[in-house]
Design a protein with these regions (language model features):
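S-adenosyl-L-methionine
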Residues: 1-118
Length: 119
């Protein structure tokens, strides 16, 4: 089922995450592995970015597709991900473009840990 359309229904957009969060809480589910742009990520329902990916299969999809398209059309040696957070962009680009060297920077320790867990 394509869950992306659920983001556009106001009532569902608010209710759906609440119900899923409660289910995760009841069953004591912390992180769950989920494939996004053909890369596996460990996602936490309590993190807004990760919740959007998990529930709606969506997070900055237009920006990611724009980046992928432009990287396909040009010849780049490096990709710099400043403020990499959990590594979303770095891992997607690294998965699609093995010849590009990825340099990721993230100053926040908890985000660095998440990034390392996603490697």
């Amino acid at each position: 089922m394509n869950r992306k359309f659920l983001r556009y229904i106001p009532f569902v957009k608010r209710l759906y995450p609440s119900i899923v969060k409660k289910i995760f809480f009841i069953f004591n589910i912390g992180e769950i592995s989920f494939k996004f742009f053909n890369v596996n990520f460990l996602l936490n329902i309590n993190e807004p970015m990760e919740r959007d990916i998990l529930l709606f299969d969506y997070y900055e999809n237009e920006q990611i597709n724009f980046l992928i398209q432009n990287l396909k059309n040009e010849n780049f040696d490096y990709f710099f991900d400043i403020g990499a957070n959990s590594g979303l962009y770095s891992l997607i680009i690294g998965n699609l473009f093995s010849s590009i060297k990825i340099k990721s920077f993230e100053p926040i320790n908890i985000s660095i840990k998440k990034f390392k867990n996603n490697l």
